[in-house]
Curated annotation (Swiss-Prot):
GO terms for cellular component: cytoplasmic side of plasma membrane. NCBIfam families: PRK04968.1. Belongs to the Syd family. This is Protein Syd. Disulfide bonds: none annotated. Keywords: Cell inner membrane, Cell membrane, Membrane. The gene is syd. It is a peripheral membrane protein. It comes from Shewanella baltica (strain OS155 / ATCC BAA-1091).
Length: 216
């Protein structure tokens, strides 16, 4: 079962929750990055939050280059989850805690996603672990949410470790169990990680790595 209907519904509920509770669209710090998602004026040189809404992509994002580079067939849900919309990260509440689903802010963000996905999968191969790919963060970035590439199930994963806790048998069921979380926009400080420079998707992963390794 495709996760796209569940993602469509969550996006609709997400924006309706903000409109109902706050009377406004959700806001996000783009850190100078343009996007078709931005509603209203945008000034790249001003450090301010923008109102946004998801925009359906005219051409679906493709991961064929990633599959070719790694000689690996990816679980097809990756195209539905990351290739259908431009969107800011989506905050959620769940029975497993609070977190966020990663999404793609613009085409540059999509390129960064592909590059970092390749890096993640190469690391899994080097560690002789089954391939996974990430969809979000849990518990303020302390844990990754990943997909088992062999069957599409959703797991909690710590970098460098094999996932041990399954959350859902499918991405569609997982998204269906989430509730939108209403919160003010948070500006995330840039960390010195050159490989993850783009402020869209991987600002979230910068926080995760800082939280994980800053505690050791």
């Amino acid at each position: 079962m495709s996760c796209l209907p569940a993602l469509d519904k969550f996006l609709q509920n997400y924006h309706q929750a903000y409109l109902t509770s706050l009377g406004e669209l959700p806001r996000y710090y783009p850190q100078g990055e343009p996007s078709v998602c931005i509603q209203g004026e945008f000034h790249a040189d001003l450090d301010q939050a923008v109102s946004w809404q998801p925009v359906k992509r005219e051409v679906e994002g493709s991961f064929a280059n990633v599959e070719h580079a790694l000689e690996l067939t990816l679980w097809p849900e990756i195209n539905h989850f990351y290739g259908q919309y431009f969107s800011a990260p989506l905050l959620f509440d769940s029975e497993w805690g609070t977190g966020e689903l990663l999404q793609v802010w613009n085409e540059d963000d999509f390129t960064c996603l592909q590059q970092n996905l390749i890096g993640h999968l190469m690391m899994k191969k080097k560690l002789k672990q089954p391939p996974t790919w990430f969809i979000g963060l849990l518990d303020e970035g302390d844990k990754m949410l990943t997909i088992n590439n062999s069957d599409g199930s959703v797991w909690i994963e710590l970098p460098g470790e094999i996932p041990t806790q399954q959350l859902s048998p499918s991405l569609a069921e997982f998204i269906g169990a989430l509730s939108p979380r209403i919160a003010p926009p948070v500006k995330h400080e840039e960390l010195p990680m050159p490989a993850l420079e783009h402020p869209g998707i991987f600002a979230s992963f910068k926080r995760m790595w800082q939280n994980l390794f800053g505690k050791r």
